[in-house]
Amino acid sequence: MAINFKRIATTIFGLAGIAAVIYGVGVTWDLHRTYTSTAQDSDAPDDAQLARGRYVAYSADCAACHTAPGAAPFAGGYPLATPFGKILSSNITSDKDTGIGSWTLAQFDRAVRHGQGSHGYLYPAMPYTSYARMTDADVRDLWAYVHSLAPVNHRVVEDQLPFPYSQRWLLGGWNLLFFRAQPFRDDSTKSVEYNRGAYLVEGAGHCAACHTAKNFLGGDSAAFLQGGSLAGWYAPDLTANPHVGVGAWSVDDIATYLATGSNEKAVSSGPMTEAIENSTQHLTSADLHAIGVYLKAQRSSSDAPAQPVAATDAAMVLGKRVYESQCIACHVSNGSGIRRMIPAFVNSPTLLSNNPATLLHIVLMGEDGPQTHANPTGAGMPRFDWKLSDDEVAAVLTYTRNSWGNAAPAVSAGTVAQARKQLVSQNWIGH
């Protein structure tokens, strides 16, 4: 019997057309449905509500993404690098023309907790997948505070993505796959402190946005808080893993790090420094300790120490020579650094991570230390892109990752070359 290819093709196209119509109807319904919320607009928020809203804004780290370098606070334009292209953050001041001054609380809630803005679906670079867990009260207070911000007329062309990622309607399918708008619920088997930490980490703090690996579509993997790549950096493991996570840290260590940008074991860098300066340093001691309690209770990831690279290995020999000529003055001979200022290398989760991306950033382009209320003049790390070859950078990182009792995979010159090329293309370092 002859195969009727025309009939098969007609059937396939017909089914595809029906699926497209169903999807279009679903997207239209989703973008126009009403969400249930007890939050109500307040015509005249009092000082107490504005203070609560400011605190929620700190906990949600709103300023970090909605403030471009050197620009007015919350006026948008901050470039957010994603695997799919660049997105510019929106203006969330009360300007009615270019900001959200004409919005209602319901529209604000729809954007923050449901990922739907005035132009359709929001990209999940806006962490509505986490903010969905925020309470009605926190959203109401946050709205009161944001609505009180001085208007800044600053029009932002947010969409910078190439086709097909520029098609926002496709995010309806993404949400169907990866987004569950589930409000936070206390775990009755846990303490009040644990639940407060869980609310902050899973909700407003949106820690998983950086510290959980993403799949090829940008959805969260199942490896919750076990580390993830972020615009060329690596957000480390936050589980109780004693090797690459916070298992060797105390609750006080975690709270101190989030409050000041450093502790006895680490000094922040990159996007984490921004988060500390803009967000966590402003949280109460009780909330920081609650975060620590929650993180310490997370099941350890499976990452185990690697076999140490032998001291006689050629990379170790070269690395020791580079370390003694370039690094020893600050990090000292035994890798202990300077307390609360220069990172110690012994049992450092950042140093021992299987992914050396953060280390490569710091060595090649340098890094300013965190500047917080507790540490107003953070130390700086000079750049070495102009001074050290790919082989030398790889060797000194391999040496520090495998000295003083450390054990981590060797870093290759090829990995350094790739990181250098990326930083050059982004104009972070010269050719």
Locate the predicted segments by residue:
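The feature marks the first
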Residues: 61-64, 81-90, 94-133, 137, ...
